[in-house]
Amino acid sequence: MATLFIADLHLCSEEPAITAGFLRFLAGTAREADALYILGDLFEAWIGDDDPEPLHREIAAALRALVQSGVPCYFIHGNRDFLLGRRFARESGMQLLPEEQVLDLYGRRVLIMHGDTLCTDDAGYQAFRAKVHKPWLQTLFLALPLRLRRRIAARMRAGSKASNSQKDLAIMDVNPQAVVDTMERQQVQWLIHGHTHRPAVHTLEANGKPAHRVVLGAWHSEGSMVKVTPDNVELVAFPF
């Protein structure tokens, strides 16, 4: 009996080893879970559900096979794949969740999220996020020809990489007060998120009691997951 959480795989055709590792995970470890939650940035980029990229079809088929085996799969958007929509969700069998979701896991109230909204010290990113999450702008972008969307996305990724290389690493991590405020607003003692690529289990105080923040690692040279059971919450790194 276990519920699994993953995030930040950044799947793309240029990283076939990560894709292969994820497919093995879906066909193996994930089949034993009560449920699988993907907390954003499953893909390196997402320019629309109508993108015919073969990788997307391959991943959708593998996720659907997991769901059809009896393991429900849930998805929270990340900062890379926030345009992933209902069409892909139907194709893959995933259920889309809001950016903050509270779960009752074996008697624990656990808040799950991607985590980028906690990085409030990075004012430039938060302003950009607010802009690209405007529904009218998303509708306009998705109406553009695929070729143009690809060019825009590539330019934005290059700009993001250049910008991040100039930023202090500290401002790209979560703001501690934002974490406490979010946990107290949701009345939880457990938070699981990704985004920062800094896997760790942090202890803090929220709601006047000890609390825990579990940060998922990115899938680079190895996989990362959080395994929640009735007795334990464990951050696990594993080979592909």
From Swiss-Prot:
Record Pfam families: Metallophos
Compartments reported by the entry: Cell inner membrane
UniProt binding sites for substrate: 79-80, 122, 160, 164, 167, 195
Catalytic reactions of this protein: UDP-2-N,3-O-bis[(3R)-3-hydroxytetradecanoyl]-alpha-D-glucosamine + H2O = 2-N,3-O-bis[(3R)-3-hydroxytetradecanoyl]-alpha-D-glucosaminyl 1-phosphate + UMP + 2 H(+)
The EC number(s) this enzyme carries: 3.6.1.54
Cofactor (UniProt): Mn(2+)
Superkingdom as given in the UniProt entry: Bacteria
Binding sites annotated in the UniProt record for Mn(2+) 2: 41, 79, 114, 195
InterPro entries with a match to the protein in the record: Calcineurin-like_PHP_ApaH, LpxH-like, Metallo-depent_PP-like, UDP-diacylglucosamine_Hdrlase
Pathway as given in its UniProt record: Glycolipid biosynthesis; lipid IV(A) biosynthesis; lipid IV(A) from (3R)-3-hydroxytetradecanoyl-[acyl-carrier-protein] and UDP-N-acetyl-alpha-D-glucosamine: step 4/6
Gene3D superfamilies, per the entry: 3.60.21.10
Keywords: Cell inner membrane, Cell membrane, Hydrolase, Lipid A biosynthesis, Lipid biosynthesis, Lipid metabolism, Manganese, Membrane, Metal-binding
Entry keyword 4Fe-4S: no
GO molecular function, one term: UDP-2,3-diacylglucosamine hydrolase activity
Cofactor binding note: Binds 2 Mn(2+) ions per subunit in a binuclear metal center.
Role description: Hydrolyzes the pyrophosphate bond of UDP-2,3-diacylglucosamine to yield 2,3-diacylglucosamine 1-phosphate (lipid X) and UMP by catalyzing the attack of water at the alpha-P atom. Involved in the biosynthesis of lipid A, a phosphorylated glycolipid that anchors the lipopolysaccharide to the outer membrane of the cell.
Entry similarity comment: Belongs to the LpxH family.
Protein name (Swiss-Prot/TrEMBL): UDP-2,3-diacylglucosamine hydrolase
The organism's taxonomic lineage, starting at the top: Bacteria, Pseudomonadati, Pseudomonadota, Gammaproteobacteria, Enterobacterales
The encoding gene: lpxH
